[in-house]
C-alpha cells in the first residue's frame, strides 16, 4: 500500500532526520534504535551492508570500509582543493576514474567496489525512507529533501539524483535554513506581525545564514550566504590534531596518525569531548591501548577548545555581515536570531552571535537537530495537496545563493540572474557574435560572484550552430536562464533571425550523472536492498534455530518437569540439542534453508516427546491445563523464533502453572539478538 503524501528528509553531513505531517502536526520519526536522528554512515563488510547507527557503531573495527561525509563530496570534482584536503582526514579511499569525478573505493563481500557520492547518499536516503515506512506502515514514494542554502547547481542536481536512486520522487529541493524558518515561524503565522528573522544554521559539515521576513503566511527570503564546508567535523579535526600531537609528545614520538583504527577511536572520543564541553568546563579523554598498546588519558578545557577553533568560530560572523549587506538591513532591524544545527550548542558560538547582535537573546525554541526535517515535512504536506488551518496561505519565496551568467568576450562573467533573486525566475538577454562570419556560438554557463569566469564555477557548455555567417554584431542571440523552484537551472539560446534554438543538456562535463548511470544505480540499489533482506532472513533463521535449541534444553532441565519426562527421552533431546548447537558454531554463514532444515529435524525429534510430556502433566491435574492447546499449535513444528518461551504458543507460561513460561526461556543472549560492545 502506498502512502499518498510525502515525507521531509534532512540529509545531513553527519546525521539525517525524517519527519511527516500527521494529525495536524509534524512527527519526527525515531529509527529502529529509538533515535530521532540517524548517522549518515554506510559500512560495507564481508557479509553485509550496514546503514545508520549499525554502521557508525562498528567504524573503529572497519574504518577503511565505513563511508561518511558523502555530502562533502557530492557535486564536487576530484581535483577540488576542498576534496583533496578532506581526503587527508578520511580513512576510506577516494579515487577518480579519469573523469575528475570522485568515487569511493571499498571492499564489499570480498570484492573491490566503487560508489559515487550520489550512491552513498542514496543509501542514507533509502534508510530514512525505510524508517518512515515502518512508522507509517505504507510504502513511501515522494519526499522533499533539504540542502544547504549555499549548495551550487551541481550539488543540488546530484542530491536530486541521489533521491532518484533511492526510489524517491523528489518533489522539491529546499534550503535547510528556509526549512528551519518554517519550523520556527509556523506558530507565528497568525499573529499578523512582520518579523525579520535571521537563521544561523551551523551543522556537522555545512554552515548557512539566511535572512527572511515572515509576514502572515509569507516567508520571503531576503538574502542567503554560508560555507558548504564548515561545521562540527572541522571542530573535531582540530581536536584530533591537538591530541595526536599530545600523544606523540607524551610517548617518545609515537605517531598514531598512521593507524586508522587508533585515529577513528580518537575521533569518536573527541566528538564526545566536544559535546561534553558544551555543558562542562572541561572534558577527559580515556582510551585503553590506543596505539602500540599504550593507554591514553588527557584533559581539555573549554577555553583550550575555544582557542583551537577560534578562527573557525569567528569565521561564522562574516556570512552574517554579508547577508545583512545584501539585504540592505541594519542588524538592529533583525527581530529574531534563530539557532539551528547541533554545532550551535557550543557556548562560544552562541556568545559570538549574541555579541554581534548587541547582546540580543537568541531564540532556541526549536530543536536544532530536528528543525530542518520539520520544515521539510511541512513543505512536503503542502506540495502533496495537504490542507490544514496551520499551513493555509503558507508561501515560501526562496532565493538563488549565487549569481548565474555566461562568458562573453575576454573571459568576462556577464550575469543574467543576480544572487539573492527570488526563485523560480526566468531572465533573457540578447547577445551577438564576436567575429565576422562566425557560423556558431559556444555558450558557457557559470555561477559565482567574480568579474572573470576563470574565478567562477563552470556549470556546463553548449553550442548554437548553423547561424548564417554575417558580419560580427549582426546576429541576435537571445539567451534565456530559467531557474526552477529547486534552484536548478535550465538554459536555452535562440538566434532570432533563423529561429535556430538549442538548450543546455546537463551532461557529464558538468560532473552530473548521465541518465544511463542513474538507471544503473537504481537497479543496483534494488539489488543491494534485496541482499540486505536476504541477510536479515538468514540471521532470523539462524536465531530461530538457536532459540529453539536453547528452549528445548531449558525445558528438559526445568525442575518443574523433573520426574515427568523419561530419562531416555531427556537424553535424546539433550544430545540432539548439543549436536545442533555444535553444528551452529561451525556453520555461522550457512544459508537460511540450511538453518530451517536443521530446525525442522530438531522439531520432528522433540515435538512428540514434549507433547507426550505435557499431556501427561495435564492429565495429572495441572491447573488450568493448556489453554487452547498451546496457541500456534505444536503439531507441524513449533514455528521458528521462540524468543523467551515456546514459539507461537504458551505465551507468558501456562496459566496457573509454570509461571513465566518455561524457566529460562530462550538463552538471553540469543533471544535479544547479538549484543553490541561499545568501542571507545
UniProtKB/Swiss-Prot annotation:
Highest taxon, organism lineage: Eukaryota
SUPFAM superfamilies the record matches: Actin-like ATPase domain, Heat shock protein 70kD (HSP70), C-terminal subdomain, Heat shock protein 70kD (HSP70), peptide-binding domain
Any one GO molecular-function label of the UniProt entry: ATP binding
Chain residue ranges for the region called Disordered: 643-680
Coiled-coil segments on the chain, per record: none
Keywords: ATP-binding, Nucleotide-binding, Stress response
Gly residues composition bias: residue spans: 643-664
One of the Pfam families matching this protein, by short name: HSP70
Disulfide bond as UniProt keyword: no
Recorded family membership: Belongs to the heat shock protein 70 family.
Protein name per its UniProtKB record: Heat shock 70 kDa protein
Species this protein is from: Trypanosoma cruzi
Gene: HSP70
Amino acid at each position: 500500500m502506498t502512502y499518498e503524501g510525502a515525507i521531509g528528509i534532512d540529509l545531513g553531513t553527519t546525521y539525517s532526520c525524517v519527519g511527516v505531517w500527521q494529525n495536524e502536526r509534524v512527527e519526527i520519526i525515531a529509527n529502529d534504535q529509538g533515535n530521532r536522528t540517524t548517522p549518515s554512515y554506510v559500512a560495507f563488510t564481508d557479509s553485509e551492508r550496514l546503514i545508520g547507527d549499525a554502521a557508525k557503531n562498528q567504524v573503529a573495527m572497519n574504518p577503511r570500509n565505513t563511508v561518511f561525509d558523502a555530502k562533502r563530496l557530492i557535486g564536487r570534482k576530484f581535483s577540488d582543493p576542498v576534496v583533496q584536503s578532506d581526503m587527508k582526514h578520511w580513512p576510506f579511499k577516494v579515487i577518480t576514474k579519469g573523469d575528475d569525478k570522485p568515487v569511493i573505493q571499498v571492499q564489499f563481500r570480498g570484492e573491490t567496489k566503487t560508489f559515487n557520492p550520489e550512491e552513498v547518499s542514496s543509501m542514507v536516503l533509502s534508510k530514512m525512507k525505510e524508517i518512515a515506512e515502518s512508522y507509517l506502515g505504507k510504502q513511501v514514494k515522494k519526499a522533499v529533501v533539504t540542502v544547504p542554502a549555499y549548495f551550487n547547481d551541481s550539488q543540488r542536481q546530484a542530491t536530486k539524483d541521489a533521491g532518484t536512486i533511492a526510489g524517491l520522487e523528489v518533489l522539491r529541493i529546499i534550503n535547510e535554513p528556509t526549512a528551519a524558518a518554517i519550523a520556527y515561524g509556523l506558530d507565528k503565522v497568525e499573529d499578523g506581525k512582520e518579523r525579520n528573522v535571521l537563521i544561523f544554521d551551523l551543522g556537522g559539515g555545512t554552515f548557512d545564514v539566511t535572512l527572511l521576513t515572515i509576514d502572515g503566511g509569507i516567508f520571503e527570503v531576503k538574502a542567503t550566504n554560508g560555507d558548504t564546508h564548515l561545521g562540527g567535523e572541522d571542530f573535531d579535526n582540530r581536536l584530533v590534531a591537538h591530541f595526536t600531537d599530545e600523544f606523540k609528545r607524551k610517548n617518545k614520538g609515537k605517531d598514531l596518525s598512521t593507524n586508522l583504527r587508533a585515529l577513528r577511536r580518537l575521533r569518536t572520543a573527541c566528538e564526545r569531548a566536544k559535546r561534553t564541553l558544551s555543558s562542562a568546563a572541561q572534558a577527559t579523554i580515556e582510551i585503553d591501548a590506543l596505539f602500540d598498546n599504550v593507554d591514553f588519558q588527557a584533559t581539555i578545557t573549554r577555553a583550550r577548545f575555544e582557542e583551537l577553533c577560534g578562527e573557525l568560530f569567528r569565521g561564522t560572523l562574516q556570512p552574517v555581515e554579508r547577508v545583512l549587506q545584501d539585504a540592505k538591513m541594519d542588524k538592529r532591524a533583525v527581530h529574531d536570531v534563530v539557532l539551528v544545527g547541533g554545532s550551535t550548542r557550543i557556548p562560544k558560538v552562541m556568545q559570538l552571535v549574541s555579541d554581534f547582535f548587541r547582546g540580543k537573546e537568541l531564540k532556541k525554541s526549536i530543536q536544532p537537530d530536528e528543525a530542518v526535517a520539520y520544515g521539510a515535512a511541512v513543505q512536503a504536506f503542502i506540495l502533496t495537496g495537504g490542507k490544514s488551518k496551520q499551513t493555509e496561505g503558507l508561501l515560501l519565496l526562496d532565493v538563488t545563493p549565487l549569481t548565474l551568467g555566461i562568458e562573453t568576450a575576454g573571459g568576462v562573467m556577464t550575469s543574467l540572474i543576480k544572487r539573492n533573486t527570488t526563485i523560480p525566475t526566468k531572465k533573457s538577454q540578447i547577445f551577438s557574435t564576436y567575429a565576422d562570419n562566425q557560423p556558431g556560438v559556444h555558450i558557457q554557463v557559470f555561477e559565482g560572484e567574480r568579474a572573470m569566469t576563470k574565478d567562477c564555477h563552470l556549470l556546463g557548455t553548449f553550442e548554437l550552430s548553423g547561424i548564417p555567417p554575417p558580419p560580427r554584431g549582426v546576429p541576435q542571440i537571445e539567451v534565456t536562464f530559467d531557474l526552477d523552484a529547486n534552484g536548478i537551472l535550465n538554459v536555452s539560446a535562440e538566434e532570432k533571425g533563423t529561429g535556430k534554438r538549442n538548450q543546455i543538456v546537463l551532461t557529464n562535463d558538468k560532473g552530473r550523472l548521465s541518465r544511463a548511470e542513474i538507471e544503473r544505480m537504481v537497479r543496483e540499489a534494488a539489488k543491494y536492498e534485496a541482499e540486505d533482506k536476504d541477510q536479515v532472513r538468514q540471521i532470523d533463521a539462524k536465531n530461530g534455530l538457536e532459540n529453539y535449541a536453547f528452549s528445548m534444553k531449558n525445558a528438559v532441565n526445568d525442575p518443574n518437569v523433573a520426574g515427568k519426562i523419561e530419562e531416555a527421552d531427556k537424553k535424546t533431546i539433550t544430545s540432539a540439542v548439543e549436536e545442533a548447537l555444535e553444528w551452529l558454531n561451525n556453520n555461522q554463514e550457512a544459508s537460511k534453508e540450511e538453518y530451517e532444515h536443521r530446525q525442522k529435524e530438531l522439531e520432528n525429534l522433540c515435538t512428540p516427546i514434549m507433547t507426550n510430556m505435557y499431556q501427561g502433566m495435564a492429565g495429572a491435574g495441572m491447573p488450568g491445563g493448556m489453554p487452547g492447546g498451546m496457541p500456534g499449535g505444536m503439531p507441524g513444528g513449533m514455528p521458528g523464533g521462540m524468543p523467551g518461551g515456546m514459539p507461537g504458543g504458551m505465551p507468558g507460561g501456562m496459566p496457573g502453572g509454570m509461571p513465566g513460561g518455561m524457566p529460562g526461556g530462550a538463552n538471553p543472549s540469543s533471544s535479544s539478538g547479538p549484543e553490541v560492545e561499545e568501542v571507545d
